[in-house]
């Protein structure tokens, strides 16, 4: 268990540093990260083994939280997975947009991270991303990813 926590912690620290050093690049990274996690991790659970959500919820650290998550997921693990994927995709796309959309995406992903933390010790380091997201909330991102990378763009990834 120590190795996944250590690897997660190093990754999270790198993302936090990126978000503080290059807020726009950090915000774009987080948006892409949530899209990849939605399609990769939750996509594989949802379409490969939706019962894994039940197994995960059954191991929640807090008994009350365990009861709530198991009761919700047990209704339909597959539907839960689809809804989780839809949420993560939506948040990822909001992070890649601009202005108020980014702020909504940041708040949504903060809630998501806080909701994941009580499920397992391995999830606790991910709360560190909230530090980066609070910092990103202070910025107004006036360009979407598309506007940042398209040819003829005046500003690139290096600008906040």
What are these regions (language model features)?
Residues 1-160:
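Extended, low-polarity transmembrane helix blocks
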């Amino acid at each position: 268990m120590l190795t996944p926590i250590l690897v997660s912690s190093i990754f999270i620290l790198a993302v936090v540093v990126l978000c503080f050093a290059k807020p726009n690049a950090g915000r774009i990274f987080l948006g892409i990260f949530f899209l990849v996690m939605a399609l990769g991790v939750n996509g594989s659970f949802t379409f490969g083994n939706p019962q894994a959500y039940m197994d995960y919820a059954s191991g929640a650290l807090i008994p009350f939280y365990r009861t709530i998550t198991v009761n919700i997921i047990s209704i339909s693990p597959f539907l839960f997975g689809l809804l989780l994927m839809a949420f993560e995709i939506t948040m990822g796309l909001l992070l890649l947009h601009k202005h108020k959309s980014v702020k909504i995406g940041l708040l949504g992903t903060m809630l998501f991270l806080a909701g994941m933390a009580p499920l397992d010790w391995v999830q606790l380091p991910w709360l560190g991303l909230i530090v980066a997201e609070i910092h990103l909330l202070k910025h107004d991102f006036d360009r979407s990813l598309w506007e940042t990378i398209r040819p003829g763009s005046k500003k690139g990834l290096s600008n906040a």
